[in-house]
């Protein structure tokens, strides 16, 4: 029992390597003047992501487009890998998500204080704050700034883990109810299918939300 619980927190390195290789396999570089449907879908998807993530940026902020697109595709594909049978999503590991959130957040903070020092400091004190509240507001805003990478990682971990656990519990209940009644099996099976579809949507939405928040942090500093 203890070994099973400890195995839950093991990082699946093999799955991560598969996730890293997936973009190169699924999103090949076009080498023909007239592309096929798969390349057309790829280009449409990338343009859609760029439009959603980079619409708020100026020309200087557009230099981050490749990083944001890569981040979105990596997290999305990693989340989807966790839905395969006998697999485990690396994004359910808080350490994996922190290893992405902390460097990206640190980069946005460093850029902000380097290129927009006054504006970055002004974010710590909202305009119109009463004088007697200034020390407390500065402390609150500083804490809010420092916990950004933690909230990024915890949000992604919690959403992916909750969905996987819900599917696992519902699937276990379906196996238990196999010998009870045919109608019960049918209802449970439909529930599992609906939860799986919902988890597919959550996997893609959480990848988008993670990249969108990084894009907003970059917008404040770039």
UniProtKB/Swiss-Prot annotation:
- GO molecular function terms noted in the UniProt entry: proton channel activity; proton-transporting ATP synthase activity, rotational mechanism
The UniProt entry, under Pfam families, shows:
ATP-synt_A (PF00119)
Q: How does it sit in the membrane?
A: Multi-pass membrane protein
Catalysed conversion reaction:
H(+)(in) = H(+)(out)
GO BP: any one term: proton motive force-driven ATP synthesis
Q: Where in the cell is it found?
A: Mitochondrion inner membrane
What does the record list as coiled-coil region(s)? none
Protein family membership: Belongs to the ATPase A chain family.
Tell me, how does this one assemble? Component of the ATP synthase complex composed at least of ATP5F1A/subunit alpha, ATP5F1B/subunit beta, ATP5MC1/subunit c (homooctomer), MT-ATP6/subunit a, MT-ATP8/subunit 8, ATP5ME/subunit e, ATP5MF/subunit f, ATP5MG/subunit g, ATP5MK/subunit k, ATP5MJ/subunit j, ATP5F1C/subunit gamma, ATP5F1D/subunit delta, ATP5F1E/subunit epsilon, ATP5PF/subunit F6, ATP5PB/subunit b, ATP5PD/subunit d, ATP5PO/subunit OSCP.
UniProt name for this protein? ATP synthase F(0) complex subunit a
């Amino acid at each position: 029992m203890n070994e099973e619980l400890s195995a839950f927190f093991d990082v699946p390195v093999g799955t991560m390597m598969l996730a890293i290789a997936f973009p190169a396999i699924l999103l090949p570089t076009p080498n023909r003047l007239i592309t096929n449907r798969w390349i057309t879908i790829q280009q449409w998807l990338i343009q859609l992501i760029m439009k959603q993530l980079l619409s708020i940026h100026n020309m200087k902020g557009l230099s981050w487009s490749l990083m944001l697109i890569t981040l979105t595709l990596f997290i999305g594909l990693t989340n989807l890998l966790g839905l395969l049978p006998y697999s485990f999503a690396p994004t359910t590991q808080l350490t994996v998500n922190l290893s992405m959130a902390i460097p990206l957040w640190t980069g946005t903070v460093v850029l902000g204080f380097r290129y927009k020092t006054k504006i970055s400091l002004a974010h710590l004190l909202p305009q119109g704050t009463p004088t007697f509240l200034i020390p407390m507001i500065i402390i609150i805003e500083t804490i809010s700034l420092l916990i950004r990478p933690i909230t990024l990682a915890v949000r992604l971990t919690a959403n992916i883990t909750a969905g996987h656990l819900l599917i696992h519990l519902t699937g276990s209940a379906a196996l238990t109810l196999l010998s009870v009644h045919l109608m019960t099996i049918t209802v449970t099976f439909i529930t599992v299918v609906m939860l799986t579809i919902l988890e597919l949507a959550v996997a893609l939405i959480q990848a988008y939300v993670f990249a969108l928040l990084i894009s907003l942090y970059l917008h404040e500093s770039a």
